[in-house]
Amino acid sequence: MRVRFFCEIDFYIVRGELSLIIKDVDTQFTVGDIAAKREELIRKLLEKGVDKINKRLEVPLVPLRLGIISSSQAAGYIDALKQFEESGIGFHITLCDVNVQGEAAASQIVAAIQTFSRRSDIDIVMIMRGGGSKGDLAVFDDESMALAISRCKHPVFTGIGHEIDT
C-alpha cells in the first residue's frame, strides 16, 4: 500500500537534528490505488465469466443449514445471528471462525469456502463481516476468493459492511 504524507522538514542547527513533521495524510492517494486495483480485478473476473458460475446453483426454497464464514466477533455476524435466532426458524448454523481483515484473512476465507464446499450438510455458504474502512474491506477484493466462490458446490451469499463504512 502506498501512502502520501504532507510533511515539513525542520533542522535544528545547534544539535544537528533533522526532524520530519507529518502535517497531513492524503487519504485519496491510497483510496485511488485501491479503487484502480479493484476495478481491474472486476474487469478480469467479468471477462472470465467468474461472476456467473456460482449464481447458476439452485438455492433451496428454505435453506436451513447455513455455513457461515466470519469472525465470531464481527458486528455483521453478531447481528445476523440475533436475527436468525429471533426468526423462530430452525436454522442450523455452522461457523467457520476466520480473520476478516489483515494479512491472513483472504487465505483463511478461501480455505473456509473450500471446506464448506466439500461438506454435504450445508445448504448455502454465507460470508459475513461488519463494516470498516475501505482498506479493511479491501481484503475481499481478492481473486483467489472470487475463484473459490465460483467453484463452491453450494450457493454463496455475502454480507459485507455494516451501517456506514468509512
Q: What spans do the regions from the language model cover?
A:
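Short, small/acidic-rich helices and loops at N termini and domain boundaries
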Residues: 1-5
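Short, glycine/charged-enriched hinge/interface segments at domain edges or termini
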Residues: 6-96
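Short glycine/threonine-rich loop/turn motifs
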Residues: 67-166
